[in-house]
């Protein structure tokens, strides 16, 4: 059975849960999204045991620095995601979106060379296992609307306002 180190910490937008395996962050989400967390972890590992840990990989410190507007704080965290090649491509491109900017799902699809795959890009965004650090909140509807965010649109709005330079 796979042992996963889990930590919970307060943030300005609610309690955040971090999950670490093999000295890499594999999941970051909000505590009130526990069902999503369990679904994604079960899909990935089938059987696992959550072991409480205190600030693994200094995630708390890095998130605290981010909330204090240190935009480079996540550079220190090693990530480990799984997903299809397409999802991995989308998630890698999300990490290239500069802090304080947004792009549309259509722009993101074009950027990865799949301009007709807007819906697939949105689905990959929805399956992002590492909220905030892989900044799916920076992707908005073509109209400029803050469409969809697994953690809630109110958090997406807060994060985007927080990141304004």
Where are these regions (language model features)?
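LysM (lysin motif) carbohydrate-binding repeats in extracellular/periplasmic proteins that recognize
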Residues: 115-118, 159
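Major-groove DNA-recognition helix of helix-turn-helix-type DNA-binding domains
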Residues: 129, 133
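Short clusters of hydrophobic/aromatic residues that line enzyme substrate/ligand-binding pockets
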Residues: 77-79, 121, 146-149
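Active-site His/Glu-centered metal-binding helix of metallohydrolases
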Residues: 139
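…primarily DNA-binding HTH/wHTH and HhH modules…
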Residues: 142-165
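Short cysteine clusters
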Residues: 136
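Basic nucleic-acid-binding alpha-helical/helix-turn surface characteristic of O6-alkylguanine DNA
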Residues: 1-115, 165
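Major-groove recognition helix of helix-turn-helix-like DNA-binding domains
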Residues: 94, 118-127
């Amino acid at each position: 059975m796979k042992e996963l180190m889990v930590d919970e910490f307060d943030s300005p937008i609610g309690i955040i849960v971090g999950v670490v395996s093999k000295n890499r962050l594999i999941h970051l989400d909000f505590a009130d999204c526990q069902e999503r967390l369990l679904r994604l972890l079960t899909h990935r590992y089938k059987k696992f045991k959550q072991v409480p840990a205190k600030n693994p990989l200094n995630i708390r410190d890095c998130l605290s620095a981010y909330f204090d507007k240190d935009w480079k704080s996540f550079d220190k965290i090693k990530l480990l995601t799984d997903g299809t090649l397409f999802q991995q491509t989308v998630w890698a491109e999300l990490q290239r979106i500069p802090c304080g900017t947004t792009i549309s799902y259509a722009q993101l699809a074009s950027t990865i060379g799949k301009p007709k795959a807007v819906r697939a890009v949105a689905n990959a965004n929805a399956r992002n296992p590492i909220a905030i650090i892989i900044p799916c909140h920076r992707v908005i509807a073509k109209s400029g609307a803050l469409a969809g965010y697994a953690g809630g649109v109110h958090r997406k709005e807060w994060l985007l306002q927080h990141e304004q330079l």
